[in-house]
Amino acid sequence: MIKSSAKHNDFGLTPDLTPLLDIIFIVMVFLLLTASVRLESLEVALPTTDSPVVNEVNKESITVNILATEPYWAIDGKPYLDWHNFSLALLESVQVDKRPVVIAADQGAEVQQLVKLLSFLQENGIQATQLLTEPSHS
């Protein structure tokens, strides 16, 4: 007996998804390329006060200085060569003296140094009561 081989139709009723996957991949690549847009920033002026009279720094406070050049850190006018020594000294000063912290940053100091200090103060539950500014000369 002669048998004919039956053709198996694998396609059936299921659609071919390859073109759909190609389109999804192309759209995904397009979105990834357009999502990496460079952030634009505006030039900003440093804050000043409008008040001609600036309150004197409370002598009963710990003054933390952020300097423009190395060493970047100082406590009550005493500079520290690195962040580790400064942070240990600041923690000790705050725990021993229980005085409020005043931050005095040099106008030419990097913002990154201020952000680092504020992050450290927040992590250790230290509240800075004042940020020193200078009066505007307009």
Curated annotation (Swiss-Prot):
It is a single-pass type II membrane protein. Residues 1-16 are cytoplasmic. One of its GO terms (cellular component) is plasma membrane. The keyword Zinc-finger does not apply. The chain crosses the membrane at residues 17-37. Keywords: Cell inner membrane, Cell membrane, Membrane, Protein transport, Transmembrane, Transmembrane helix, Transport. Involved in the TonB-dependent energy-dependent transport of various receptor-bound substrates. The accessory proteins ExbB and ExbD seem to form a complex with TonB. This is Biopolymer transport protein exbD1. It comes from Vibrio cholerae serotype O1 (strain ATCC 39315 / El Tor Inaba N16961).
